[in-house]
Design a protein with these regions (language model features):
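Membrane-proximal interfacial segments on either side of biological membranes
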Residues: 1-113, 122-324
Length: 324
């Protein structure tokens, strides 16, 4: 590829196929100064990445430079289409459009629109993002497959299956928040399975905690709602309420789990160690001060015999989720 020498080796990108076309014109005059314009076109591009592969890249950009300002997509938006991107996650049908002025201003904004992709057997999209930003751009999750997600992340201590939906309002210039009052909820039945070695380890270290954790070894979740907040330092806060049953123990006894988790998302993304954090939370939360409230082997646990954050109650009816 003739353009390969123009790409830094540090990027780990190796061009594979595709066609590239560009046209440019410029002028310099005493009164008008320097102006330029043109367009770039990439058809069916493909490349090897440092940790993956990209194929089916189509890119069209028209531009104009005048008075130190770039006009992007003067007649039609800058268009990006990618058929497939295989990296940490497999993504298909990626779309994005960009139009406006850079540097942007209130009178000459820059707008990112039509952003979407198919990912994890579901779809992810972003509402129009206008810069300068006044309103949140909403990242919408539709039927994201947890089984596909956990297959990629491979946490050791637990696994989940089923699909979820969600909406995450994104802020780029908020003094505190990147995501505020987002939510993720189940789309149909979910299942949760805790690792046997994890639950056995907790049971051996604390018999009371073991009685409670036994109800979480396997859960069929009928209702799950998680509030999501993320500050601009990367501090992620998840506040969840889960209703389900352990059909392997008693399908008529509901288990309600209230769970709050805090994590630095930037560090978490680097480590992807979800399971270790869950184990730490379980060990800290499912601990009672004494064994006096441990139920007998022949009896079902009551709400008072479970630790704070977990309760057991008749399944019918399960209360409607309260608005956050």
């Amino acid at each position: 590829m003739v353009f390969q020498p123009l790409i830094s080796k540090d990027l780990g990108i190796k061009l594979r196929d595709g066609t590239f076309y560009a046209q440019a014109a410029f002028s310099a005059a005493r009164e008008q100064g320097f102006t330029a314009g043109g367009h770039w076109v990439v058809n069916n591009g493909g490349m090897w990445l440092q940790d993956g592969e990209l194929s089916g890249l189509d890119f069209v950009m028209s531009y104009r430079l005048q008075n130190h300002h770039w006009q992007l997509g003067a007649k039609e938006p800058v268009m990006l289409r990618i058929a497939s991107l295989n990296n940490l996650f497999d993504m298909q049908n990626i779309t994005a459009d960009l139009q406006g002025t850079y540097p942007y201003s209130e009178t000459a904004p820059l707008t990112l629109s039509n952003v979407g992709m198919d990912i994890l057997n579901g779809h992810l999209s972003l509402s129009a993002l206008r810069l300068p930003q006044h309103d949140a751009a909403v990242l919408k999750l539709s039927q994201i497959d947890l089984s596909a997600l956990f297959t990629v992340l491979q946490p050791k201590q637990f696994a989940m299956s089923g699909k979820v939906n969600g909406e995450l309002p994104l802020y780029l210039n908020n003094p505190q928040w990147l995501v505020r009052n987002g939510w993720i909820a189940n789309d149909g039945m979910l299942t949760l399975r805790l690792d046997k070695d994890l639950t056995d380890s907790i049971s051996e270290s604390n018999t009371v905690a073991g009685a409670a954790i036994d109800w979480l070894r396997y859960m069929e979740i009928s209702q799950s709602y998680t509030k999501v907040d993320l500050d601009n330092l990367g501090q992620l806060t998840l506040t969840s309420k889960v209703h389900g049953v352990n059909s392997q123990k008693n399908s008529t006894r509901a288990v309600v789990l209230n769970y709050q988790h805090k994590e630095n998302l930037f560090q978490l993304w680097r480590s992807l160690r979800f399971g270790d954090n869950l184990q730490e939370w379980l060990q800290q939360t499912i601990s009672l001060p004494s064994a006096s409230s441990l139920p007998s082997a022949s009896s079902l646990p009551s709400a008072s015999s479970l630790p704070q954050g977990i309760s057991s109650q008749p399944t019918a009816p399960i209360p409607t989720r309260a608005k956050e």
